[in-house]
Curated annotation (Swiss-Prot):
Gene (UniProt): cimA
Protein name: Putative (R)-citramalate synthase CimA
Enzyme Commission number, as recorded: 2.3.3.21
Domain of life: Archaea
Entry keyword ATP-binding: no
Swiss-Prot/TrEMBL GO biological process terms: isoleucine biosynthetic process; L-leucine biosynthetic process
PANTHER family per UniProt: (R)-CITRAMALATE SYNTHASE CIMA, HOMOCITRATE SYNTHASE
Amino acid sequence: MIALFGEKLRFFDTTLRDGEQTPGVSLTPDQKCIIATALAAVGVDVIEAGSAAASPGDRAAIRQIANAGLGVEVCTFVRAMTGDIDAAVECGVDSVHLVVPVSDLHIQKKLRKDRATVAAMANKAVDYAKERGLIVELSGEDASRADQSFLAEVFASGVEHGADRLCFCDTVGLMTPERTALMIPPLAAIAPLSIHCHDDLGFGLATTIAALKAGASCAHVTVNGLGERAGNTPLEEVVMALERLYGYDTRIRTERLYPLSVLVSRLTGVPLPAQKPIVGELAFTHESGIHADGILKDPSTYEPLAPETVGRTRRIILGKHSGSASVEAALQESGYRPTPAQLQVIVARVKHLGDQGHRVTDGDLAAIAEAVLEVSTEPVLVLKQFTVVSGSGVLPTASVTLLVNGAEVTNAATGTGPVDAAIEALRRSVADVAAISLLEYHVDAITGGTDALVEVTATLSNGEMTRTSRGAETDIIAASVEAVVQGMNRLLRRRDEDRR
């Protein structure tokens, strides 16, 4: 199967350039450097760190990344303009992604020029960049709508002038795998060719794979598929498709893909869709009784790849679709051992809660189990009071007082907002007995109006296990505190049971 591909496939990551062009995304130089370091650790070959001509901030970021000693090729986007190339040289990059419009639509409508002028601009820019010691990747913008004969001429001439690599840009995502299989081979014969796809019609991944099969040797990608409009081809999806479907060793450290995805989502402020392949919250989550039963017997029954491969863990959640096997497994994980008759009662109550439209959390399951099994437990933590101060020009600050195993503990903390401050104060209050971190936080307004009942779902971890709990109040801070305290209690109680 590896014979489908030619030389070693390369990954050109443009998260910090094309990805940052996602509407509303703006990264600081330090944030860009953090992401670049993570990209290098994952194993991409080229990092397009930004556009040197875009702004002083982008130049500072590119310079910082170029000087970071990451051990990968650092590139910047440039137009066929000497000023752009001078800025690239000033930043100390290894290469330039020299982008030239090649479709008549772009040449005539955007540039107000003709083909001959654009071809000459490309050659002149290649000459200028090579004279300054740069690696040049000559990219045909809107190549999928270009006259392919003209595109081939531009590419061939660019290579004659010293271009090291070429790139076919499907700028608005109009390519299909069938067209790709026909159009890529003659271009790949000219020089090493990259494929750069946008995902406007959902074909980005399929077109990228088709291009690699047809002779392209490098995939342009972004983490989480970030990019303008509908985004670009996602790094994590291309890598795992090649690994899992074609048996190709990408040499990417796949176990770092999910941590990288979470990092980029956090720094860009772009949330991950729950059902996004590979990295979405639900990508390795199961509820259906039939599926969960199969997963418990053999994970490959309902999973295309092991979650650990990409740095994930499997989750089985409970709801109206759950069966006895998944409920029993969840109960056993929490330390409960019901009889068959008790299990059926618990399953019925779980389904009833799901029918009410609720997500059944670990706290819900524990409450149901303890009621059915007639278990009485004393909580490790008891909330006595909390206070939050927040407002315009005021650093959000929270103070909480808890009874921890009967001993009163008071802690204060600041945060990015009142909820963040309250959760941090709670975390500090239990720091002496456990290191607990918040993994996921979700808010829903259950009712309408200004006095709406707010439901908060929080997932916490102590490094060994996770627990999900829920709080419901008209005050979002109170609901958050309730959910976190409940989750902490579940983790601490299970830890104490394991020690016994």
